[in-house]
């Protein structure tokens, strides 16, 4: 093949189609548990959540003030992946191997939101949310008066089993427009190229560069919508996590009306979760009992947790 702008453009059209196919075919889970925000600036500050009167009433004025005072914001980051294609491969028509590479680039860009969101859950024991405490923490302050005054009572959104060393699972309330996690996108994934014959890289290294680029980020929403269970995936521990979320109150003792809708587990707990959520009956000693959790939760087996 003679390397000309027209021949490169024709190949780019084909490879963009492969890239787009990878984007569209990749499975995703993040939007089940995260609020998706279209970003238009370098970072988003989430004090704007307080502009919704019903939300301010629900979480309390102090919570919104905290978000504003702490400047709780999520800064967008640029992510890119690049592949170099030898000019010799162009000239020798050795290009068939690259179509699946571009398709995989599209797939990688599509699953990255899952990687970001589920990493938030995993890191939630060490990363702070709007109140300055870690997202999963035993000392989230809740105040006795509606205006946020009085001596704060520490509230935990962690259930912890003694001597447990395995993988935790998570209960989330995703029934509302505002969800426990936030995914924001500044620029959707796009395929870009450096293919001018007189580009320095083409001249020096004898290869054209193609890359996928996007700007996005993820962060924490309201900790009240999430409970981490550091314990075996059993019916008893599931009920403990359920009841803990149901007990959450805002400042002044206001009932929040939260209830888990989703259970998120790593792949290592998939079998146990499927059995726990779908079986009609459980063995209890010498008898069987009904499974009262059947059908109560939507299961998310997180590929990137």
From Swiss-Prot:
Biological source species: Escherichia phage Mu (Bacteriophage Mu)
Lineage top rank: taxon: Viruses
Compartment annotation: Virion; Host cytoplasm
Entry GO terms, CC: host cell cytoplasm; viral capsid, major subunit
Gene name in the database record: T
Entries under Pfam families matching the protein: Mu-like_gpT
Ubl conjugation among keywords: no
Induction conditions: Expressed in the late phase of the viral replicative cycle. Expression of late genes is activated by the viral late transcription activator C.
Name assigned to this protein: Major capsid protein
């Amino acid at each position: 093949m003679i390397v000309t702008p027209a021949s490169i453009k024709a190949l780019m059209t084909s490879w963009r189609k492969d890239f787009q196919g990878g984007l569209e075919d990749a499975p995703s889970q993040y939007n089940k548990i995260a609020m998706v925000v279209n970003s238009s600036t370098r970072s988003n500050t989430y004090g704007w959540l307080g502009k919704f009167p019903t939300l301010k009433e629900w979480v309390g004025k102090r919570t919104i003030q905290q978000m504003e005072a702490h400047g709780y914001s999520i800064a967008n980051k640029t992510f890119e992946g690049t592949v170099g294609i030898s000019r010799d491969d162009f000239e020798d028509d050795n290009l068939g191997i690259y179509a699946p590479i571009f398709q995989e680039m599209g797939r990688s860009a599509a699953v990255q939101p899952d990687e970001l969101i589920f990493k938030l859950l995993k890191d939630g024991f060490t990363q702070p949310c709007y109140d300055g405490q870690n997202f999963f923490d035993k000392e989230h302050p809740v105040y006795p008066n509606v205006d946020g005054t009085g001596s704060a009572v520490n509230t935990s959104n962690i259930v912890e089993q003694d001597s447990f060393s395995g993988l935790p699972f998570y209960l989330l309330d995703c029934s509302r427009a505002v969800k426990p996690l936030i995914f924001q996108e500044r620029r959707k994934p796009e395929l870009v190229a450096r293919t001018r014959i007189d580009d320095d890289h083409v001249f020096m290294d004898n290869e054209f560069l193609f890359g996928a680029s996007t700007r996005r980020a993820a962060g924490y929403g309201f900790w009240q919508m999430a409970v981490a269970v550091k314990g075996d995936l059993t019916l008893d521990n599931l009920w403990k996590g359920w009841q803990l979320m149901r007990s959450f109150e805002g400042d002044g003792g206001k009932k929040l009306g939260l209830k888990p809708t989703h259970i998120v587990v790593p792949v290592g707990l998939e079998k146990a979760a499927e059995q726990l959520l779908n079986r009609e009956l459980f063995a209890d000693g010498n008898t069987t009992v009904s499974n009262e959790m059947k059908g109560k939760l939507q299961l998310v087996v997180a590929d990137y947790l």
